[in-house]
């Protein structure tokens, strides 16, 4: 838990005793947390999926893999995800065993079936994915959609244009699969998925308009003067983080020619 992670990172366990389990976002290296995941799954983990490679999401995957086995094959579970992009921070480097592509499905079969469909959603990071649990109409949103705050878009690994486009993509996916609930990587479950996504996009665009207004009013200003105007509704202690997302907004505005 902390400023960047809120109440901590949510790990999700998908499956039943007869199908085995998929673990999504095993989190940082934390032996006690790994023990809890193994206990909850009886160690029968068929796949590990990381929504992205930030240090609060993916480093625990290797330890969980080493300490788990697929009960039907005796093999350790493969780590699934997308490799880090060229702009990732050193602490966010990640090379999965299985590289997931948009539309891929990771499936558990038994008396019931559990299907996770991959939705590639760059924006928070270049390698971010979300997951649709098809049978249950649930969206596992990683850090793209949070409960309690908006996610940080930290250039260059983070990209505001990609983030907004990915929100549109998630909106369409939720409509197509009748998704009502979003399971974020930080915070509690969100209901009314379509409204959440629409409101989040509107909030981002409203913030971008405030950033543009701050620059238009003071073209010779700097990040410190602009953040005080564009984020005047945000506690000052959070302005250093806000400046990272503000830079992503400025990059987006410059790309569209709205600011010099």
Model-derived features: where do they sit?
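Divalent metal-coordination and catalytic microenvironments
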Residues: 14, 25, 52, 100, ...
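Active-site environment of divalent metal-dependent phosphoester hydrolases
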Residues: 30-31, 53-60, 86-88, 126-128, ...
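Divalent-metal (often Zn2+) His-rich catalytic cores of metallo-beta-lactamase-fold enzymes
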Residues: 138, 160-218
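Conserved beta-strand hairpin/beta-sheet module of binuclear metal-dependent hydrolase folds
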Residues: 1-41, 130-142, 147
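C-terminal regulatory/interaction regions
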Residues: 213-260
